[in-house]
């Protein structure tokens, strides 16, 4: 386990999946879910080279079929620590024989965590080291504790969105998205009350860059933690029915397949492409408020 800290925050990150494990403020208050396997055994997994699911867990490159687990393999793969300073950690995953079995590309994936005051910058960097174009998706899945909620009790949370009436998608058809099912989420000037039933049909998904900022509010109605992101999609999730006291806010460069999708990997919705030698970099920001 690696650690970085400043006068406001302390982070712990595991080399397994380059996964953020803990966010504590100067008073020792924890903001990130503890990974209790009774509810959900992760904290903040990195999603790569796909986000969410494939139709029948299968995709095609030039007609050849491959399989990948939901959210890809990065979250369960050991990364190497390649950089450490007082305020920044960088982990890297380079393709190998094992990754190439189900993802036939050469790549270098780097995940960095940088502290800046009360902010955590989570930085994704993908480099194409192949001699051909590569395709990929990437995303985050951090789980934040909801103020006032406890394990074993029904989860209720108040969120603040920067869009008062975004349109949601439904990803509940074999783990993939029903292309026809859409619904406007009504809020009170961006204030959105959620509970476990909100996620009865899996994550609430907003695409087309409708939402760029989400806050979890505390019991006084003030921001507790805020995420800012530039991704075209974001998922909001809680494991409904488990009485788990957290909400995941998931910025995504990618989405599940459409239900019944049987096309080529390159034709997936929200697919990212890199030419040989090119690289992709983006970040999202976690702001610890109160």
Describe the role of every protein-language-model region.
Residues 92-98, 252-254, 287:
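Generic short beta-strand segments
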Residues 1-61, 65-69, 210-231, 278-288:
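Beta-strand-rich N-terminal accessory domains
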Residues 65-117:
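Extended, loop-rich substrate-binding clefts of extracytoplasmic carbohydrate-active enzymes
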Residues 9, 71, 76-83, 187-269:
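Acidic/His-leaning functional-site neighborhoods
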Residues 4, 95-149:
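Acidic, contiguous internal or C-terminal segments within carbohydrate-active enzymes
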Residues 82-89, 114-119, 148, 153, ...:
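A short, structured loop/turn motif at beta-sheet edges
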Residues 133-135, 143-146, 150-229:
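Active-site/ligand-binding surface loops and adjacent short beta/alpha elements
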Residues 110-112, 269-274:
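Beta-strand-rich interaction surfaces with strong enrichment in secreted/lumenal proteins
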């Amino acid at each position: 386990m690696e650690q970085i800290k400043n006068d406001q925050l302390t982070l712990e990150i595991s080399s397994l999946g380059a996964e953020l494990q803990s966010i504590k403020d100067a008073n020792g208050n924890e903001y990130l879910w503890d990974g209790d396997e009774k509810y959900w055994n992760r904290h903040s997994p990195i999603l790569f080279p796909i986000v969410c699911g494939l139709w029948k867990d299968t995709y095609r490159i030039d007609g050849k079929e491959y399989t990948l687990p939901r959210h890809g393999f990065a979250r369960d793969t050991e990364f190497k620590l390649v950089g450490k300073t007082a305020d920044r950690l960088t982990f890297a995953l380079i393709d190998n024989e094992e990754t190439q079995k189900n993802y036939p590309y050469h790549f270098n994936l780097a995940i960095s965590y940088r502290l800046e005051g009360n902010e955590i910058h989570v930085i994704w960097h993908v480099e194409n080291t192949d001699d051909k174009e590569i395709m990929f998706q990437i995303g985050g899945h951090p789980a934040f504790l909801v103020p006032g909620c406890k394990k074993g009790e029904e989860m209720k949370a108040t969120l603040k969105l920067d869009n008062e009436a975004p349109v949601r998608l439904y990803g509940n058809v074999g783990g993939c998205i029903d292309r026809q099912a859409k619904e406007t989420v009504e809020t009170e000037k961006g204030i959105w009350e959620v509970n476990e039933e909100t996620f009865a049909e899996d994550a609430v998904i907003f695409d087309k860059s409708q939402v760029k900022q989400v806050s979890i509010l505390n019991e006084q109605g003030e921001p507790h933690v805020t995420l800012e992101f530039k991704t075209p999609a974001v998922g909001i999730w809680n494991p409904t029915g488990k009485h788990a006291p957290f909400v995941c806010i998931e910025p995504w460069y990618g989405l599940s397949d459409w239900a019944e999708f049987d096309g080529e990997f390159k034709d997936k919705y929200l697919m990212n492409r890199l030419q040989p030698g090119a690289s992709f970099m983006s970040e999202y920001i976690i702001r610890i408020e109160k």
